[in-house]
Design a protein with these regions (language model features):
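A hydrophobic/aromatic-rich effector-binding and dimerization subdomain
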Residues: 1-19, 67-134, 148-164
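Basic/polar phosphate-binding segments, predominantly the helix-turn-helix DNA-binding elements
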Residues: 186, 191-228, 242, 248-277
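Alpha-helical structural segments
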Residues: 180, 227-232, 277, 281
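Short, Lys/Arg-enriched, Trp-marked, Pro/Gly-tolerant hinge/linker segments that flank
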Residues: 107-117, 132-143, 152-183, 187, ...
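Regular secondary-structure segments
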Residues: 42, 122-136, 182, 186-189, ...
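Generic protein-terminus/edge-of-domain signal
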Residues: 1-58, 77, 258, 285-313
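Conserved metal-binding segment of the jelly-roll/cupin
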Residues: 57-70
Length: 313
């Protein structure tokens, strides 16, 4: 199956500049976002693809994804349980402005950190989550104290580079532009969409936008749009008794034959063959995070129970 990237939107409603959760993940499509992300594999294992590289992550591994770094996660067998921390680039910018420009050179941190430092990092993540879940006046300070400890470990023990002002400005501008474009595609894929129209909206030439799309997402614009429509059709077919023809038109294909071709190209089978293996199940409601994602975010009570079982104070 060809990979693609989406631009993941992350809100910081619980604590400024910081989001934490535990997720049981089967599959997370290739995506990118403006936040730095750390994931501790609590149980299970997963294959992590970052652009053209892959990492196998088992229990205890800590994964690091830079802001703007595309990545895909696929569990090996049973769902992988991940403790996730997402930090916006505004974190500690007032007292350490370089943080906006730092890019780390390691994805699986077991390859970069000594065992005792990796253990300290995992514990700081768990303590940060414990504080994050508390609704008390001191909780945000306790959480951010652990986040500061995490960054102290990363900056002292893992390789990184500092982007130049020009590189940083270019990455930020491109990230904001891709956010607008991908949000537009996410909300208009069922309609006729042309690269020329989006280029005009962005004040770019069609050639420049086509190049930017390939550079940022490693896939041509039309292939990305077709993949977006295919995944929407797969979701619709899996969760209802919609016919193939109706699903094709509802998801933006101008002719059902293009849906057939997309199935063959990306999955190596016809829609009917795929349906035999994925019979409609209306009970499989889409995730609140992403309707095309096979994952479940644990509730706060479930997270607390897990921390209790791990004897995290």
């Amino acid at each position: 199956m060809e990979s693609y990237n989406e631009y993941e939107l992350i809100s910081h409603s619980k604590l400024a500049d910081c989001t934490m959760f535990i997720v049981d993940m089967v599959y997370r499509p290739m995506h990118l976002h403006k936040e730095l992300e750390l994931c501790v594999v609590l149980s299970g294992s997963c294959r992590v693809s970052t652009d053209r590289h892959g990492v196998e992550a088992g229990p205890g591994e800590v994964l690091l994804f830079d802001a703007g770094s595309s990545h895909e996660l696929c569990a090996s067998g049973v769902p992988a349980r991940l403790l996730t921390l997402q930090i916006s680039n505004s974190f500690c910018a007032r007292f350490y402005p370089q943080i906006r420009s730092i890019r780390f050179g390691c994805r699986g941190l077991s390859a970069c950190l000594l065992p005792e430092r990796l253990t300290a990092l995992r514990r700081a993540m768990l303590l940060a989550l414990r504080a994050y879940l508390r609704d008390t006046p001191e909780a945000p300070f306790a959480c951010m104290a652990q986040v500061n400890e995490i960054f102290a470990i990363l900056l002292s023990d893992t390789p990184y580079r500092v982007l130049s002002d020009t590189e940083n400005m270019t990455q930020t501008r491109n990230a904001e532009r891709m956010h607008r474009i991908l949000h537009y595609l996410e909300t208009h894929y069922s309609e006729p969409v042309r690269l020329s129209e989006i280029a005009e909206r962005e004040g770019l030439t069609q050639t420049y936008l086509s190049h930017l799309f390939r550079e940022q997402l490693h896939i041509p614009f039309q292939d990305y749009l077709a993949r977006l429509r295919l995944e929407a059709a797969m979701l619709l077919l899996r969760q209802s008794d919609t016919t193939l023809t109706d699903a094709a038109y509802a998801c933006g294909f101008s002719d059902p034959k293009y849906l057939n071709r997309s199935f063959q190209k990306n999955l190596g089978m016809s829609p009917r063959q795929w349906l035999q293996e994925n019979r409609p199940d209306p009970s499989r409601a889409p995730s609140a995070e992403d309707p095309r994602t096979a994952q479940r975010i644990l509730t706060p009570d479930e997270c607390r129970a897990l921390l209790d079982a791990l004897e995290i104070p």
